[in-house]
UniProtKB/Swiss-Prot annotation:
GO molecular function: ATP binding; ATP-dependent protein folding chaperone; unfolded protein binding
SUPFAM superfamilies noted in UniProt: Actin-like ATPase domain (SSF53067), Heat shock protein 70kD (HSP70), peptide-binding domain (SSF100920)
A GO term from the CC aspect: kinetoplast
Primary location recorded for the protein, binned into one broad class: mitochondrion
Signal peptide: none
Protein source organism: Trypanosoma cruzi
A single GO BP: DNA replication
Matching InterPro entries: ATPase_NBD, Chaperone_DnaK, Heat_shock_70_CS, HSP70_C_sf, HSP70_peptide-bd_sf, Hsp_70_fam
Region called Disordered, residue ranges: 624-656
Keyword vocabulary terms for this entry: ATP-binding, DNA replication, Kinetoplast, Mitochondrion, Nucleotide-binding, Stress response, Transit peptide
Name this protein carries in UniProt: Heat shock 70 kDa protein, mitochondrial
């Protein structure tokens, strides 16, 4: 059955496969899972992928960025200070990427995050720090990608420029383009934007030899995806994909946070919903409790001094049981099953044909989720891959394939949503149906003029599954101009859709009579312009320079502290160094300490003070060593003379 299907698929997707394998990538290729809550990076070691540890020693890095004065913090450092700096600490920004400000999901998020979300000049949703400076979601994502790039470079010992970046399978065109923009801003050449479940399937099936049909259930920090894939003879073919780009661990945290807020209000009468710092503490406590309830039946939530009233300090103290949390999250778990049903239907497979259900994403550790998946698919899910690392491992594997380091593996992915144009009467005419294997290209001639002597035609591109164009998401629009005057309906306009392996779409309109063409790359009706991306790259580079200078100053401070401590210890141990020399060291030590305490000291100034101290200590150390050696030599000589005298006396006595 599998071989027959794949032979058919192979013939249908021959052009796609040829384009997919058309060019070999040179240089290192890293795989990055840019997650909503956590991100990680992997590289190929030989024929096996490996997830790398960051500078803090962890394999997963919080997808959190903060601004504190002129300082930019990324990862764990940013997350640790979120409670005291909630308005300038950005988390879960991936949920905003490629979205318009008026999007209903954005309006929902505005009420639930401590930082501000505002409308940018192009109409997209951007975040804003406490000083009023706006950042695009792509820019914030770029700061996280820079951290991943740095992690890989530290491990490899060389610069890295190529990356495979994963994204939710149900991301639309603008969201994929925004993800690629984030990589560009971070200084990366994003050679593929690959669906997370597809990457996880690569990690799962890399060492599998048996033909199989699998489902990948990916419930992460901010998004949910379900994909059905067929694996046979090294070919990974995605049959169908579905999902919800606004369902994930953040929503589970939120439902538990709301419960804590409600219970606290019941017991104290105090509403904390408008207190940003308190909300951030509760959110962090909810996330911690959620994780603990995956392995324990109940957990304590204790937040001392959360607020105060006329009765004094108030504290959050409560016990949350697993059953209570599961009842709060029941609707969220059930929401994931709707896309599962649609995906199975679109893949045209029976549940009995699914031989394995692979769980991916941190939320799949929740017992309620595991049970729901088991009941839906009728089998115990496979939990043999690390749910936090599988996607990055798959990304690195795909990088190995593109470098031709990994042989005999082919990936055939799909576009998650239908793409088409608006035609007469506002109808949505599909050009590329959903779940079409990509890359793909399709042309169709159905446009013409609607009026006599009309010289231009407007093309509106939409993505979605509704029958009327207005009910779907408009991805972009452009005009084909210079059409020769002719009666209505005579000119023939050919429209071509061309989707890259990344899932990014290019649309071209051509007047068949004159050969004139006009094209557009689908980014978004807003999206980042080339100038904005270049400005953000410069901004990123300036941050990189300031970060480098800051790191160098920290290293110089650490060295100064070490030298100062050494000098203080030596001053108490020297026996042969003169008082004048000791006083000189004390003077230089005081100068070094003063420089260290100066918040505005430069690296060169502190280095100079440290070098003077170090040089003086070394001179005194040399004096100490020489004087001590001379003293030992004199003592040894005296002992030798005495011994010789005793031996002579003993000899005289023996002669007598």
């Amino acid at each position: 059955m599998f071989a027959r299907r794949l032979r058919g698929a192979g013939s249908l997707a021959a052009a796609s496969l040829a384009r997919w394998q058309s060019s070999k990538v040179t240089g290192d290729v890293i795989g990055i899972d840019l997650g909503t809550t956590y991100s990680c990076v992997a590289v190929m070691e030989g024929d096996k992928p490996r997830v790398l540890e960051n500078t803090e020693g962890f394999r997963a890095t919080p997808s959190v960025v903060a601004f504190k004065g002129q300082e930019k913090l990324v990862g764990l450092a940013a997350k640790r200070q979120a409670v005291t700096n909630p308005q300038s600490t950005f988390f879960a920004v991936k949920r905003l990427i490629g979205r318009r400000f008026e999007d209903s999901n954005i309006q929902h998020d505005i009420k639930n995050v401590p930082y501000k979300i505002g409308r940018s000049s192009n109409g997209d949703a951007w975040v804003q720090d406490a000083n009023g400076k706006q950042y695009s979601p792509s820019q914030v994502g770029a700061f996280v990608l820079e951290k991943m790039k740095e992690t890989a470079e530290n491990f490899l010992g060389r610069k890295v420029s190529n990356a495979v970046v994963t994204c939710p399978a149900y991301f639309n065109g603008p969201q994929r383009q925004a993800t690629k923009d984030a990589g560009t801003i971070a200084g990366l050449n994003v050679i593929r934007v690959v669906n997370g479940p597809t990457a996880a399937a690569l990690a799962y099936g890399l060492d599998k030899t048996k033909d199989s049909m699998i489902a990948v259930y990916d419930l992460g920090g901010g998004t949910f995806d379900i994909s059905v894939l067929e694996i046979a003879g090294g070919v990974f073919e995605v049959k169908a994909t579905n999902g919800d780009t606004h369902l994930g661990g953040e929503d589970f945290d939120l439902c538990l946070s709301d419960y804590i807020l409600t219970e606290f209000k019941k017991s104290t009468g105090i509403d904390l919903s408008n207190e940003r710092m308190a909300l951030q503490r509760i959110r962090e406590a909810a996330e911690k409790a959620k994780c603990e309830l995956s392995t324990t039946m109940e957990t304590e939530v204790n937040l001392p001094f959360i607020t105060a009233n006329q009765d004094g300090a108030q504290h959050v103290q409560m016990t949350v049981s697993r059953s209570k949390f599961e009842s709060l999250a029941e609707k969220l778990v059930q929401r994931s099953l709707g896309p599962c049903k649609q995906c199975i239907k679109d893949a045209a497979v029976d549940l009995k044909e699914i031989s394995e259900v692979v769980l991916v994403g941190g939320m799949t550790r929740m017992p309620k989720v595991i049970e729901a998946v088991k009941q839906f698919f009728g089998r115990d899910p496979f939990r043999g891959v690390n749910p936090d690392e599988a996607v990055a491992l798959g990304g690195a594997t795909l990088g190995g394939v593109l470098r031709r380091d990994v042989k005999g593996l082919v990936l055939l992915d799909v576009t998650p949503l239908s793409l088409g144009v608006e035609t007469l009467g506002g109808v949505f005419t599909r050009m590329i149906p959903k779940n079409t294997t990509i890359p793909t290209k399709k042309s169709q001639t159905f446009f013409s003029t609607a009026a006599f002597n009309q010289t231009q035609v407007g093309i509106k591109v939409f993505q979605g599954e509704r029958e009327m164009a207005a009910d779907n998401q408009m991805m972009g629009q452009f005009d084909l101009v210079g059409i020769p005057p002719a009666p209505r309906g005579v000119p023939q306009i050919e429209v071509t859709f061309d989707i890259e392996p990344n899932g990014i779409c290019h649309v071209t309109a051509k007047d068949k009579a004159t050969g004139k063409t006009q094209n557009i790359t689908i980014t978004a009706s807003g999206g980042l312009s080339k100038e904005q991306i270049e400005r953000m790259i410069r901004d990123s580079e300036s941050h990189a320079e300031s970060d480098r200078l800051k790191r160098e100053l920290v290293e110089v401070r650490n060295n100064a502290e070490t030298q100062a401590n050494t000098a203080e210890r030596q001053l108490t141990e020297w026996k042969y160094v003169s008082d004048a020399e000791k006083e000189n060291v004390r003077t230089l030590l005081r100068a070094c300490r003063k420089s260290m305490e100066n918040p505005n000291v430069t690296k060169d100034e502190l280095s100079a003070a440290t070098d003077k101290l170090q040089k003086a200590v070394m001179e005194c150390g040399r004096t100490e060593y020489q004087q001590a050696a001379a003293g030992n030599s004199s003592s040894s000589s005296g002992n030798t003379d005495s011994s010789q005298g005793e031996q002579q006396q003993q000899g005289d006595q023996q002669k007598q």
